[in-house]
């Protein structure tokens, strides 16, 4: 086959795959809407809403999936997230890994805001301590800088329930690296 024919053939195969995926997605959504619980349907809506916002926002899938909202403050950053069935563990409470992800994302967002142009910050270590159940309908993570050096940064974050009670505390170390294009 010539290169032009290869390209046309590959485009046709991709279109067929897209149609198959679209059909499968439609079947899965219908199955959840027909047989799923209300919580299943809410999780599906949250996932699809996050994905629908992806092209319009320069955010990660994690931010969109969990509904993270960021506000830079005079002393750092506050990141909030809704508490939904998507983030519950088998006990029906917020999974510790999700709280850790919230803290890491908040600290990483602040770290990447602070690095010089052409550089990025990556997590090298994170410690998390849980104090209370993360109850309520929203969590807020407040983070601040403990140390900013030429090659490393250290941050502290505190995760609060909507009633103001701290449910988690973490520190994170970040290494400054060249940004990949």
Give the residues covered by each predicted segment:
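Terminal targeting signals and extreme-terminal segments of soluble enzymes
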Residues: 2-140, 146-181
């Amino acid at each position: 086959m010539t290169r032009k024919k290869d390209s046309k053939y590959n485009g046709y195969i991709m279109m067929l795959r897209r149609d198959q995926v679209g059909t499968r997605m439609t079947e899965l959504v219908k199955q959840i809407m027909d047989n799923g619980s209300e919580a299943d349907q809410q999780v599906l809506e949250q996932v699809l809403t996050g994905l629908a916002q992806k092209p319009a926002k320069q955010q990660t899938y994690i931010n969109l999936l969990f509904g993270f909202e960021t506000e830079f403050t005079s002393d750092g950053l506050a990141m909030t997230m809704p508490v939904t069935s998507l983030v519950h563990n088998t006990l029906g409470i917020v999974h510790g890994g999700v709280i850790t992800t919230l803290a890491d994302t908040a600290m990483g967002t602040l770290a990447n805001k602070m690095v010089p142009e052409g550089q990025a910050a990556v997590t090298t270590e994170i410690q998390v301590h849980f104090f209370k159940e993360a109850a309520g309908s929203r969590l807020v993570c407040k983070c601040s800088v403990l140390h900013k050096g030429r090659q490393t940064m250290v941050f502290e974050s505190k995760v609060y329930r909507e009633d103001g009670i701290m449910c988690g505390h973490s520190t994170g170390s970040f290494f400054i690296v060249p940004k990949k294009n």
